[in-house]
Amino acid sequence: MSLGLLCCVAFSLLWAGPMNAGVTQTPKFHVLKTGQSMTLLCAQDMNHEYMYRYRQDPGKGLRLIYYSVAAALTDKGEVPNGYNVSRSNTEDFPLKLESAAPSQTSVYFCASSY
């Protein structure tokens, strides 16, 4: 299998707040073949209303994919193409990669705030 057929997607955990905040993202690392789909789970236990999904490409700053201002209320950020989100409760904000592409090789972040 050639390297051109693989899409390496790196995941990271973003700690928000002054202490160890309760935001977790899983899996931390994953490699996908081009065309595969997967869901990045994000959970927070601080009862925050606002949640955000970002990506950071090599040598670039953070770019907002999607955000949510409350359960069941989501909106697109600057780079939503190829992704879907849902937020059925306050705690969870999963991000689904519909069909992995090499252009989605990135570090992904999840954050929450009041």
Curated annotation (Swiss-Prot):
It comes from the Eukaryota. The keyword Glycoprotein applies. It is found in: Cell membrane. Disulfide bonds join C42-C110. It holds the Pfam family V-set. Keywords: Adaptive immunity, Cell membrane, Disulfide bond, Glycoprotein, Immunity, Immunoglobulin domain, Membrane, Receptor, Signal, T cell receptor. GO terms for cellular component: plasma membrane; T cell receptor complex. GO terms for biological process: adaptive immune response; cell surface receptor signaling pathway. Residues 1-21 form the signal peptide. This is Probable non-functional T cell receptor beta variable 6-7. It comes from Homo sapiens.
